[in-house]
Amino acid sequence: MTLTLKKRLKNAGILTAVFIVAVIIFSYVTNKGNDNMTADMGAATFPQISFSYGEYKINTLTGYAKRMDISSMHNTITPVANQSLDVNVEAYGNKFTGASYKVYTMDGTSQLEHKKIKKVGKGFTLDLSGKKVLDEERILEVRLNRNGADPVYFYTRIVSDEDAHVTECLNYISDYHENALGKVENAGVGAALEPTDDADNTTLQHVTINSNYEQVTWGSLKPQVEQGERWSIKELNSTCMSVQLQYRVSCKGEENEADRYAVKEFFRVRYIADAKKTYLLDYDRTMEQIFDATQKVLNEKGIILGIAPANLSYKVNKDGTIVSFVEANELWNYNKDSDEISLVFGFADAENTDVRNMVSDHKIKLLKVDAKGNTTFLVSGYMDRGEHEGEVGVAVYYYDIEKNSVEEKVFISTNKSYAQAESELGEMSYYDAKTDMLYTMVDGTLYQYSGEDAEKKALVKGLDAQQYVVSEDGRLIAYQANGDLETATKVTILNVETGKKQKVTCGKGECIRPLGFVRSDFVYGVAKTEDIGNTVSGEATVPMYKLEIRNQKGKVIKKYQTDGIYILSASFDEDMITLERASKDGDTYTATAPDYITNNEQKTKSNIALETYATDLKQTQVRLTYNDGIADKEPKVLKPKQILFERPQTITFSDKDAPEKYYVYGHGDIQGVYTKAGDAIKKANDYNGVVVDSSQNYVWERGNRNLQYSITDKDDVLNTIKDRLKNQEKPIDILKDVNNGEAYDLTGCTTEEILYIINQGRPVIAMLDSQNAVILVGYSDTNVVYEDLNDSTRHSVKYEEMDQMTSGSGNTYIG
């Protein structure tokens, strides 16, 4: 080797060493005080369990990292045969030192059983023969103790399979599912349907029992199931069974040879033992295309989303060049200028086919896309993998488009079920990246959390559910700033994005109520304090004589006022406001016909819009259309890294003072949370579902009642109700006294909807007008039975006639 070459190598080595030292110093300086690194989201590590029932593997359960609130765990129900239950364990590499299980009452207040399992292996059997363990529906908690890791917890409701005909129902569902997939003719698929003229037979995205045979049998898609179905029994009693199947299918494509879809398929069935036949009571199936950026997803018009919901969530930047959108529980970002498309967030993706990551017990909510395309979003519910694997809560994330990274800003942890986290915490939270502030409403307390100094403070406390409203995007919160519901004279509108506040006040002798938002326009009502009274049921009410809509500039853009008519409440559906109205009779307000207001606020125009179009194979499809088109149709696919902190910020909130709530479950998922039982029942009826209260007591179930029923041996109770009604006492107070402090306002329900309440042995007061009432005490398959207040003679009228009789009170029932 020549001297010159040696010298060059020596100099090169010195330069390399200097460069490495410089990089280390630069890295230290730029990261000083910020202990973080970037990495892919970690793989799932938790085991899973399922249960065997005959030849079926049912209710595959995901594990929780900590003990959960028993009374909130409603997701599945597992039938128990012969007082024992076979548990299957999918270890996924975990080693176990043992297991244990406990059985609780539904409200979680009483533990009925606790036993230990020494050897886990591939499964074990639970002995449930203990006293009172299976007397009625219970909650089962299974704990797996892992070697070298924290224990994992699993929850399901359990019930005896006696008279439930579980095998017959599961067989029917399995056959129907397979025959629909295979388009098998004369196999009972079409015969079980109930086609109607108003069913939408132009889309495969959502089909129901009212759809036609062609839609239910997947059109021309020729689906093939991938990795099997996940069977979950959602409701089970002696009259019917509800089951949800979740799976993925590969179908014939158009732009691509094949497309993949996430599917949820719901069945509600009944087995009639005498006829030895199973009947389909309800059917509901949704499918959503899994966006695969490695295939053709762009054309000259925009981004092809395929078969997807027509109201798919998306937000665009100011220039209309960048869009973030959510499809099949994955968040994507497309930048037209840089020709890049990024999978911002998703537990399951093309590279990760672990079935544990395909559990869709979470929801992604877009909060904001700024001018550069940076995206702020929430993930609420159960966390399949990553930093918070096995936890339930709300994670706040910030996607930095220039750094191609996703940073978790804060995690709100809860011990409630994923369904409650989604519907409550997730809907009431907002994060602003500029100020690094999180705002969340928890049971009437508005909290502000600073990410910079990790401090939490309550801005407003003690608000009733009717005292505040939150805009759909969570950016605007309006609340009564002084007094209570009946006396507040001021409402504060807080823009959590800017921190700015607006005040709205009313006149002397008046009170003001926030009602809601139509996009960014604030809707509120004004009442006169002298008008405050009661509804026919006896519930206190603040009747508003006028309603106003105010824009963000503080200008009133619409008023609603009708002589002699008062507004009791308002509900919102996009740009439509439905007003529940009443007329006055003394101090009592009797419901009258609702009215409707359409707000004409113009949507902000953008270069990007969500549109639908149709093709022969896939029928109705969805596209994010660029008005100026797309030139390059082969984008660069990016997968952002996650920024991981040594000490991620996690916060919790207390809900010890939470008011009574009613949870609606239907079609396999939670469908709403209400503070009034009647509203919950009406919603549940739309989904053939159930209503439970905060302690998991069943308030209402579709169809689970006797065909005929009569309340007997309660003459003393009925006489007490009659005497107190004659004394003009409030119906709601009377029934609270006779029902151990519990009474349901069922106003607005139909007679047929409240038969379940009567079947529980609870007399129902039916108000004929503001003063007169009858007591419902029984029913047949067509008629309802009632007693007048002045005697014990029982009268029978058709359901529809009773609805007509109570129309003078706005169909007021109290049970």
Predicted feature descriptions by range:
Residues 710-815:
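Conserved active-site-adjacent core of cysteine acyl-enzyme catalytic domains
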Residues 30-49:
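Ser/Thr/Pro/Gly-rich low-complexity linker/stalk segments immediately outside membranes or between
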Residues 17-19, 23, 27-35, 71-86, ...:
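Surface-exposed, charged secondary-structure patches
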Residues 240-277, 284:
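Exposed beta-sheet edge and beta->alpha loop/turn motif
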Residues 113-116, 282-283, 341-350, 406-414, ...:
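Beta-propeller fold detector
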Residues 336-339, 401-403, 450-454, 495-499, ...:
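Short loop/turn segments that connect beta-strands within beta-propeller blades
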